[in-house]
Amino acid sequence: MDKYYKENRYYIAETSKAFTYYMKDVIDKKNLAFCHSKLYYKDIYSFAGVSESYGEKILNMEKHTKNRDLIIRFCVAGRFQLNEINTALKLYGMKPLYAKDKRDACIIVAINNRKYDLGDIDDMLVKNGLVKLSADG
């Protein structure tokens, strides 16, 4: 229990900022693991299809969005694994990816196969008659 508390203390302490702390923590961990290809926030915002200022406000919880796809795009840009994406969605107050939903299932398959290119994910969605994940979808 002590280990769990230490690892999750920031998310527990201030629930209004839990999403922010979680996203930054996961991105920082990935930057340590993949030091040869560092993730920059400006690139994550660009990949997600939003301006740097708007993306920063969403990530810092200064503005709220009801656009679940935007949060998923942030996670895909950050190369999050499925469990990390679902945690981020839950912390933001959105439903996690659900395998019985056809569109979510396509996204899950892409993530589980480590396809983090939005174009590839969009192609898979379109081939299945589903709405793109990209901002222009």
Each model region followed by its residue ranges:
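A short, Lys/Arg-rich alpha-helix, primarily the initiator
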Residues: 2-41, 119-136
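Short, leucine-enriched amphipathic alpha-helices that occur as contiguous helical runs
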Residues: 16-20, 52, 103
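Short, charged amphipathic recognition helices of the HTH superfamily
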Residues: 29-45, 67-71, 102-106, 117
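Recognition helix of helix-turn-helix/homeodomain-like DNA-binding domains
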Residues: 48-66, 91-93
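Short, basic-rich loop-to-helix N-cap that marks the start of a DNA-contacting helix
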Residues: 62-77
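Glycine-rich phosphate/pyrophosphate-binding loops
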Residues: 80-86
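Short, charged recognition helix plus adjacent turn
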Residues: 86-114
